[in-house]
Amino acid sequence: MDSLLARVKRAADADALNPAQEGVTGGPDAAGLPDVSTSSPGGGGAGDKLKEKMDEYKDKLINEIENLPIWAIVLIIAGSLLFLVCCVYCVCRRSCRKRKKKEGKKGLKGAVDLKSVQLLGNSYKEKVQPDLDELPVNMEDNEDAESTKSEVKLGKLQFSLDYDFQKGELSVNVIQAADLPGMDMSGTSDPYVKVYLLPDKKKKYETKVHRKTLNPVFNESFTFKVPYAEVGSKILTFAVYDFDRFSKHDQIGQVQVPLNSIDLGRVVEDWKDLQSPDTESEKENKLGDICFSLRYVPTAGKLTVVILEAKNLKKMDVGGLSDPYVKIALLQGTKRLKKKKTTIKKNTLNPYFNESFGFEVPFEQIQKVTLIITVVDYDRIGTSEPIGRCVLGCNSSGTELRHWSDMLANPRRPIAQWHTLQEVPEKN
């Protein structure tokens, strides 16, 4: 029995040993197992499929972009650039905020504790805050120093005088000026000289304007009728101005020559430093200024006058104001061709009008007419009084002649200019 069991056991062990050897020597096909090296469930097969899908999506995207119109492509690119710029701006702004916060914290570290300063007593206060009684003295010293520094040379003027005793005439020659200050933004000036006799100023002459120069050469002569008996009471005045078409002319300086202080028996030629105009000479403009434009169309024979505004008019009423209006008169010789006037502006010394007036003036008559613009103070009860006037035409002089000439030289173009009002002669 024991021998039978031993034989059965050996046979079973032999059967179990043979299949195991076949599985080892026969390879995967013999054992019925799958080839792990070539086909695994999570291996290269799935990766190849993913790559194929990506290539497919890429091709579709390229095809769609190629089919898009040009404006859509440009819009996409612009949007992308805008997004990029916004991102950069946000990053820069955030970094700047962080930097400011850091600087603020640094500044706070150096702040002074006011309580601790108060505890230091008067010794610290005296060092930091000086005695207030000393401040005015120091300030006055500084003002004196600044006033001496602010003294600016106004330049100088050369002129000559020759008096004819037989005719009772004074010939004045304005030769030149030198080292004038720059009155314009460009550092230059447009100087001209007014020449008149004080105290009456009945006759006033002006030189030509010299553009953009600080050393003008005039060489212009003028003659005043002055009887010898009146020579001693006259003061010859040279007032140098900077010409400005659109605003009031600025006075640079003046030279005053009392005729009783010079030897009229010979020709006098001299240089004089320009002095600042005093209050009396500034009253030359006491009547005020007026601004108006002139426009002439030769083909239509039409002269257009636009009264724009006036300023610094003379006070004519008891209350220190005026009720101004402007009269425009067109004359040929002594004959008045046309007369017009603006509206009345109540209680003002700086009226604004902006009123236009037209006159029919044929081209052959434009050289013969005279335009008189008069500012009048309206009075309801009594007689309206004239404040001052301007006379323009080919026979006028100074800024008035210059304005008239500019109008004729620029047809169809309005030429605006400020004028100083002159006294209206009394009627006989």
Curated annotation (Swiss-Prot):
Ca(2+) 2 binds at D184, D242, D244, D250. Residues 1-67 are vesicular. GO terms for biological process: calcium ion-regulated exocytosis of neurotransmitter; negative regulation of calcium ion-dependent exocytosis; synaptic vesicle endocytosis; synaptic vesicle exocytosis. One of its GO terms (cellular component) is dense core granule. Ca(2+) 1 binds at D184, D190, D242, F243, D244. Acts as inhibitor of neurotransmitter release. Overexpression leads to a decrease in the amplitude of the excitatory postsynaptic potential in dissected cholinergic and glutaminergic neurons while depletion with antisense oligonucleotides leads to an increase. Overexpression of isoform 1 blocks the reversal of synaptic depression by serotonin in sensory neurons. This is Synaptotagmin-1. It comes from Aplysia californica (California sea hare). The lineage of its organism: Eukaryota, Metazoa, Spiralia, Lophotrochozoa, Mollusca. The gene is SYT1.
